[in-house]
């Protein structure tokens, strides 16, 4: 009998609840934490959107498209009904981060900026950066097409020179792609993983990115490998996660791309159809800010 991939996530949560080290953290909430975890999710004919609770699929999709656009303005995402970056872009949060001179919503040179304009001088979220810095994402796609056996198929959001200007340094900071047998796989290194809220989102987001890059390069999705550094459960998520652990995984949904897309910048939210997603009910959890 094949074990459902979702059990890897659930088993990590169990391990943290049973044996995690009690640690303080930036938010003041406190965590239980373990260091070093790996899980592998097959993308063949399925999409790893967790089923033991409902995951906000539209939020996953819109956030990734926002990254791909190179945007650093949380207001742009919020206007699409996705509020997941609102707290980190608030006037109060920016002031506490030493960035009180910024307009609310200006997150600094975070994920999308590093993916599309690595090395450019950051001014603000309204500036047009076209032609500035290294477009890692476009270069990555081109290299997969030209040299699929390359060991340099890397995309990074971690730029030490820019960290002080970011509202929040990247948690999911580096991924590497790998081509074999006509399939594209992706391995993500995540320095900090919030098991209750963030990690289910991150699994889906990088799996979606793998589907998109595979589509553009004429490959099939293979595996998503997720490596976590500090894997933690916030103390106010312990009881909600205990509820989640009582539930059995259901079949993963399938993801279809509905039209032929030729350029990474041409993807739209309506290009994706998630089919057969029948999860357990949502479990409310407060985000630690």
Curated annotation (Swiss-Prot):
Active site: residue positions: 171
Residues at which dUMP binds: 26, 151-152, 191-194, 202, 232-234
EC number(s) on file: 2.1.1.45
Keywords for the protein's UniProt record, in alphabetical order: Methyltransferase, Nucleotide biosynthesis, Transferase
Name of one Pfam family that matches: Thymidylat_synt
Name of the protein in question: Thymidylate synthase
GO biological process: dTMP biosynthetic process; dTTP biosynthetic process; methylation
Assembly behavior: Homodimer.
Catalysed reactions, semicolon-separated: dUMP + (6R)-5,10-methylene-5,6,7,8-tetrahydrofolate = 7,8-dihydrofolate + dTMP
Domain of life: Viruses
Binding-site residues for (6R)-5,10-methylene-5,6,7,8-tetrahydrofolate, renumbered to this chain: 194, 288
Uppermost EC category: transferase
GO MF terms held by the record: thymidylate synthase activity
SUPFAM superfamilies reported for this sequence: Thymidylate synthase/dCMP hydroxymethylase (SSF55831)
Family in the record: Belongs to the thymidylate synthase family.
InterPro entries: Thymidate_synth/dCMP_Mease, Thymidate_synth/dCMP_Mease_dom, Thymidate_synth/dCMP_Mease_sf, Thymidylate_synthase, Thymidylate_synthase_AS
Pathway noted in the entry: Pyrimidine metabolism; dTTP biosynthesis
Cysteines joined through disulfide linkages: none
């Amino acid at each position: 009998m094949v074990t459902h991939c979702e059990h890897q996530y659930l088993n990590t949560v169990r391990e943290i609840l049973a044996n995690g080290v009690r640690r303080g953290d930036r938010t003041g909430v406190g965590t239980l934490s373990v260091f070093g975890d790996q899980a592998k999710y097959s993308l063949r004919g399925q999409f790893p959107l967790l089923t033991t609770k409902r995951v906000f699929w539209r939020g996953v999709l819109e956030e990734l498209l926002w990254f791909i656009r190179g945007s650093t303005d949380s207001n742009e995402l919020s206007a699409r009904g996705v509020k997941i970056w609102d707290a980190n872009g608030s006037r109060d949060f920016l002031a506490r981060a030493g960035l009180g001179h910024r307009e609310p919503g200006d997150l600094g040179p975070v994920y999308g900026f590093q993916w599309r304009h690595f090395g450019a001088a950051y001014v603000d979220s309204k500036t047009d950066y076209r032609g500035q810095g290294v477009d890692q994402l476009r270069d990555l796609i081109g290299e997969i097409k030209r040299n699929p056996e390359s060991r340099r198929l890397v995309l990074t959001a971690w730029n030490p020179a820019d960290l002080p200007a970011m509202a929040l340094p990247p948690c999911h900071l580096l991924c590497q792609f790998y081509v074999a047998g006509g399939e594209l796989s992706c391995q993500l290194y995540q320095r900090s993983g919030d098991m209750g809220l963030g990690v289910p989102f991150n699994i889906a987001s990088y799996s979606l990115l793998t589907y998109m890059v595979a589509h553009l390069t004429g490959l099939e999705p293979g595996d998503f490998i997720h490596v976590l550094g500090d894997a933690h459960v916030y103390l106010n998520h312990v009881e909600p996660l205990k509820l989640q652990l009582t539930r059995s995984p259901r079949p993963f949904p399938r993801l279809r791309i509905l039209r032929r897309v030729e350029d990474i910048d041409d993807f739209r939210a309506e290009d994706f159809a998630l089919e057969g997603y029948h999860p357990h009910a949502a479990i409310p959890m407060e985000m630690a800010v």
